[in-house]
Design a protein with these regions (language model features):
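Active-site neighborhoods and metal-handling regions in enzymes and metal-associated proteins
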Residues: 1-327
Length: 327
């Protein structure tokens, strides 16, 4: 049936628009249709002679959110924020990570959300140093930091939040120092989110703060420029500072334009800002730093006047987190 319809409709058209590479069977089907039409060329049937990948066109449209989409993303971000707050208030040493995951899901479902936007990460202690840890089955020990990366999906629109907080409600001195470094890196990145800046500037701003911090802690040696050029910082910070957000958690859209320059930020774009620090056990690292894993992630909307943090209802300063956990 489909073959009959397509073979009737596409003759005489110059171009077929198609998302190339997403489904190899559909790719082959289109090639077969064109081949069949070309075989009828002597009968005056004109086959399309171009196939254009529609991905770039559709992805560019998805970069700028409509008012409806922004409203959905605000609501999704609020629900995810409430879920993170619930986990902070619920946690106790000697619980298991999956118990916090259950609290996250409880909040999602009580707000009408049937599923998370992605597999939630509930990582206590050294588990937080594994970027995509999803086992969520370890016991939470007194003194652990807990990294939760969790978001929900509302009407197809994703939220994506990470918070890192102490299992016992109080950051230690070392945890405080590293946490503040990551928070300062995020603050520096947020200052670069406006229509005056391009995509990579928030990452560059966050990375500068982190590199300086790694030097101060003795984790990296040399000048900021040397550490950047050699990539020595990647032992402790190995990912980018953000990604597009929307219908997918890592949403569609290029990060550079056709001239290979970073895209300028525009009103309606939505992205994450998520610097981190991950210190695995190593003979090169002071033992008191081992197993510290911290990430702070917010969802951000670019506006005419700057930006709006959509996930602002979940606390992230040391004082505000400790105050919430003490309630």
């Amino acid at each position: 049936m489909l073959d009959e319809i397509v073979l009737k409709e596409i003759p005489g058209h110059q171009k077929i628009y198609h998302r190339i590479g997403q489904d190899i069977l559909i790719d082959q089907k289109i090639n077969d249709w064109i081949k069949q039409l070309r075989e009828k060329g002597r009968a005056g049937v004109r086959a399309p002679h171009e196939i254009e990948d529609i991905s770039y066109i559709a992805d560019e449209m998805r970069l700028i959110k409509s008012d409806f989409e922004i409203d959905m993303m605000r609501r999704s971000a609020k629900i995810a924020s409430l879920a993170h707050n619930r986990a902070m208030k619920f946690v106790k040493p000697h619980m298991y990570e999956y118990e916090l995951e259950a609290e996250i899901m409880h909040e999602f479902m009580s707000q009408g959300i049937r599923s998370p936007a992605y597999q939630s990460i509930i990582a206590a202690g050294g588990n937080a140093c594994t970027l995509h840890y999803i086992n969520n089955n370890s016991e939470i020990k007194d003194g652990d930091l807990i990294l939760i990366d969790a978001g929900c999906e509302l009407e197809g629109y994703a939220s994506d939040i990470t918070r890192t907080f102490p299992a016992n409600g109080k950051y230690t001195k070392i945890q405080t120092d590293f946490y503040q470094m990551v928070l300062d890196a995020q603050s520096a990145a947020l200052k670069m989110i406006s229509t005056k800046h391009h995509w990579n500037e928030p990452h560059e701003a966050a990375l500068s703060v982190l590199i300086d911090g790694f030097r101060d802690f003795g984790l990296c040696q040399g000048s900021r420029e040397e550490i950047y050029e050699t990539g020595a910082y990647k032992e402790f910070y190995m990912h980018r500072t953000g990604h597009w957000l929307g219908l997918d958690v890592h949403d569609a859209g290029e990060y550079k334009n056709v001239s290979k320059e970073w895209k300028q930020l525009k009103p309606g774009m939505t992205l994450t800002v998520e610097p981190g620090c991950y210190i695995r056990p190593s003979s090169k690292v002071p033992k008191e730093f081992w197993n510290i894993g911290i990430r702070i992630e917010d969802d951000v909307l670019v506006t005419q006047d700057g930006h709006e943090v959509l996930t602002k209802e979940s606390p992230k300063t040391i004082e505000s987190i400790e105050a919430l956990m003490a309630k």
